[in-house]
């Protein structure tokens, strides 16, 4: 199943992997939104048993473990070594791969179900990601993915704009762009808005740190700054009813492999 011709190294991906590795110890407790999104994603398909499931961007293996307990054979893949260590410690899968979703070291048509929850927004090119998922999935198989679309983290982005002119939030594709990329495939997409409210800015920032979502593609870290700048950010934040809201434009997708 595993291809021998595998090589991937990039500064961006190394930095992303490091951010998630630093969060490996806190991820399981902090990833409430990721778990909620993952279970909604599962509702898009019925039970799949006695199949090879690829959990692409598995994190600490929460959903790998779910698939394995359903009787599937699971391959857990992540860019972060520390995340994979956590997954392996709980025996979440039968096999583990430290690899990049955009360069899957897997032979063609070896996977029955490709599952990727809240991971592909960290990739360089969604076209490449979906092409790789399609390549490794067998005819008759299914690809399930969730990701973030434009408008996610908008409150944090708007607050930072009032502090300085530097980008502090990664750009997300619009829903229309994601639809266009999925056009070559037999696919179904839906988007819904989810808002998470925090009692203070510190809790909000900590929630991002807790799941490793602090890497900015241009080389800075999201939301990390001096105390004075954080105070300015807090003053600029659009507080509603005493709470700090954070929006997520969630996209759920299913691709049927012909």
From Swiss-Prot:
Highest taxon, organism lineage: Bacteria
UniProt keyword Repeat, yes or no: no
Pathway: Cofactor biosynthesis; biotin biosynthesis
Disulphide bonds in the chain: none
E.C. code: 2.1.1.197
Keyword S-adenosyl-L-methionine set for record: yes
GO molecular function: carboxyl-O-methyltransferase activity; malonyl-CoA methyltransferase activity; S-adenosylmethionine-dependent methyltransferase activity
UniProt enzyme class: transferase
Swiss-Prot/TrEMBL GO biological process terms: biotin biosynthetic process; methylation
Catalytic activity: malonyl-[ACP] + S-adenosyl-L-methionine = malonyl-[ACP] methyl ester + S-adenosyl-L-homocysteine
Gene3D superfamilies, alphabetized: Vaccinia Virus protein VP39
One Pfam family cited in the UniProt record for this chain: Methyltransf_11
Xref: CDD domains: AdoMet_MTases
Keyword tags: Biotin biosynthesis, Methyltransferase, S-adenosyl-L-methionine, Transferase
Record's function text: Converts the free carboxyl group of a malonyl-thioester to its methyl ester by transfer of a methyl group from S-adenosyl-L-methionine (SAM). It allows to synthesize pimeloyl-ACP via the fatty acid synthetic pathway.
Family to which the UniProt record says this protein belongs: Belongs to the methyltransferase superfamily.
Listed name of the protein: Malonyl-[acyl-carrier protein] O-methyltransferase
Species whose genome carries this gene: Hamiltonella defensa subsp. Acyrthosiphon pisum (strain 5AT)
Organism classification: Bacteria, Pseudomonadati, Pseudomonadota, Gammaproteobacteria, Enterobacterales
């Amino acid at each position: 199943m595993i291809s021998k011709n595998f090589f991937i190294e990039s500064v961006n991906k190394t930095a992303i992997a490091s951010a998630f590795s630093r969060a490996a110890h806190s991820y399981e407790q902090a990833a409430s939104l990721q778990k909620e999104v993952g279970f909604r994603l599962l509702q898009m398909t019925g039970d799949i048993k006695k199949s090879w499931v690829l959990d692409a961007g598995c994190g600490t293996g929460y959903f790998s473990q779910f698939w394995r307990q359903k009787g599937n054979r699971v391959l857990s893949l992540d860019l972060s070594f520390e995340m994979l260590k956590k997954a392996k410690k709980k025996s979440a899968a039968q096999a583990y791969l430290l690899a990049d979703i955009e360069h899957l070291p897997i032979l063609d048509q070896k996977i029955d179900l490709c599952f990727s929850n809240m991971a592909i927004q960290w990739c360089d090119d969604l076209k490449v990601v979906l092409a790789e998922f399609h390549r490794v999935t067998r005819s008759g198989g299914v690809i399930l993915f969730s990701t973030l679309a434009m408008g996610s983290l908008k409150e944090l982005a708007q607050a930072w704009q009032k502090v300085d002119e530097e980008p502090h939030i990664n750009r997300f594709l619009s829903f229309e762009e994601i639809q266009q990329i999925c056009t070559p495939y037999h696919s179904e997409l839906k988007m819904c808005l989810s808002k998470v409210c925090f009692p203070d800015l510190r809790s909000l920032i900590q929630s991002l740190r807790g799941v490793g979502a602090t890497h900015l593609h241009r080389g800075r870290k999201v939301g990390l700054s001096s105390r004075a700048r954080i105070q300015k950010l807090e003053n600029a934040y659009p507080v509603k009813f005493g709470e700090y809201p954070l929006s997520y434009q969630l996209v759920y997708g299913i691709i049927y492999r012909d």
